[in-house]
From Swiss-Prot:
Its EC number is 1.5.1.43. One of its GO terms (biological process) is polyamine biosynthetic process. It comes from Vibrio cholerae serotype O1 (strain ATCC 39315 / El Tor Inaba N16961). Keywords: NADP, Oxidoreductase, Polyamine biosynthesis. This is Carboxynorspermidine synthase.
Length: 414
């Protein structure tokens, strides 16, 4: 058995550590990235933490350009993995899926392939490019597990669990995500700044009363009392799992909410207003062409560097309301992750941890034959039971909290 991991950023760091801790099942591990030095740094950390469970298994680094399908196919054929785990940025998903199809090897990723902001890449068409592989993968006898992070990913498994055990009829699904931790910086992103800052500046698109609705970012807000973290303002925004939840778990309203502090929003709004968040090319006086968002990315702290001093909790969950046995019911299925615990385990912060742990939990379901049917699948389509039974032992627990039924007080912010 063996895996090929592509990507050596923050998520890739955690994925590699967790794969190493479970290499008795996953087998040999090859980590590949455009920068082989990043792969080697991860390997050094794994060995330094004694996280390689079976020292007889291989742990190697390779160089690859994840945009180059021919190079990817060549690497896959050389490594001969049973599963390719894509821990790279979203825009390489389709190239890696095509390479896996050509090499006839199964595939897993942690997010949708588009930015959710650009025309033709928004929530209603979010998975079109990857769902186009369904027949190809099925005919080739290989599996693709899409968006196996936390959100997207585990939150969809929570919804599937709710539909299977807790509800006869679902009215609303609200995915809620806050980071109650503190990294000590005035402004920083917890994962790739380019991906993060594109994601949160687009219009919010959500499903309501049989249609997609759209509002400007940060203009729909509610307050929610998170267990162990307290009350937080969360804002409606576009997110990957809205499309797949709408496809596989019918509900009257499906919406994603993320917590932002006032200071963060002040910085964000200022940078957006002066054009620093633009991904479009800009020509300087000397003729140099730059993209403001990429310049900003180069100036911001590397998300990996935030880990050593990070303190506090994250809380991410799925708030489901509907009926069970004819009675109204409201439940919040959630997880807490602790930044300090994550750093002690894998030398990284909890944001990356909550993506990397589910990816390896899903990979284990593939290797154990639980999630290995040929075809292309989102997490909602798969049996939630073995995944939720396994995830606590990989590093993330989960709980169910009963709430008083009643729709949230959603406020319009101008």
């Amino acid at each position: 058995m063996s895996i090929l991991q592509i990507g050596a950023g923050g998520v890739g760091w955690v994925v590699a550590h967790k794969a190493a801790q479970n290499n008795d099942v996953l087998g040999d591990i090859t980590i590949a990235s455009r920068s082989i030095a990043k792969c080697e740094k991860i390997i050094e950390s794994i060995k330094g933490k004694n996280n390689l469970k079976d020292s007889s298994k291989k742990l190697e680094a390779r160089q690859v350009n994840a945009d180059d399908i021919e190079s990817l196919v060549k690497l896959i054929n050389e490594v001969k993995p049973d599963l390719v785990i894509n821990a790279g940025p979203p825009w390489v998903n389709v190239a890696i899926m095509e390479a896996c199809y050509q090499a006839k090897v199964s595939y897993l990723d942690t997010s949708v392939s588009v930015d959710l902001c650009s025309k033709g890449q928004q929530v209603p068409e979010a998975y079109d490019a990857q769902w186009a592989f369904r027949d190809k993968f099925k005919q080739a006898g290989i599996t693709a597990i899409l968006s196996a992070g936390f959100d997207p990913g585990v939150v969809s498994v929570f919804a599937a669990y709710a539909a299977k055990y807790l509800f006869d009829e679902i009215d609303t699904i609200d995915v809620l995500d806050i980071n109650a931790g503190d990294h000590g910086k005035k402004f920083a992103t917890n994962f790739d700044p380019e991906t993060n800052l594109l994601e949160i500046q687009g219009d919010s698109i959500y499903w309501d009363a049989g249609e997609w609705k759209r509002v400007p970012c940060h203009t729909r807000m509610l307050e929610f009392d998170f267990p162990k973290c307290g009350k937080f303002k969360v804002y409606s925004m576009s997110h990957d799992e809205l499309r797949s939840l709408k496809e596989f778990i019918p509900a009257k309203r499906i919406e994603f909410w993320m917590g932002f502090g006032d200071r963060y929003l002040n910085y964000f709004n200022m940078m957006r207003d002066i054009g620093l968040l633009s991904p479009e090319p800009l020509t300087l006086q000397d003729g140099t062409v730059v993209k403001p968002l990429q310049v900003l990315k180069a100036m911001l702290p590397d998300p990996t560097s935030l880990a050593p001093g990070y303190k506090g909790l994250t809380c991410i969950g799925t708030w489901v309301q509907g009926k069970k046995d004819g009675k109204a019911r409201s439940v919040f299925i959630y997880n807490h992750a602790d930044h300090e615990v994550a750093y002690h385990d894998v030398e990284h912060q909890a944001i990356a941890y909550t993506t990397g742990v589910p990816a390896i939990t899903a990979a284990l379901q593939f290797f154990r034959g639980e999630w290995a049917e040929p075809g292309v699948f989102n997490m909602e389509q798969l049996n939630p039971d073995p995944f939720l039974e396994t995830m606590p032992s990989i590093g993330l627990g989960w709980d169910v909290m009963e709430l008083e039924p009643g729709q949230p007080d959603i406020q319009v912010v101008k």
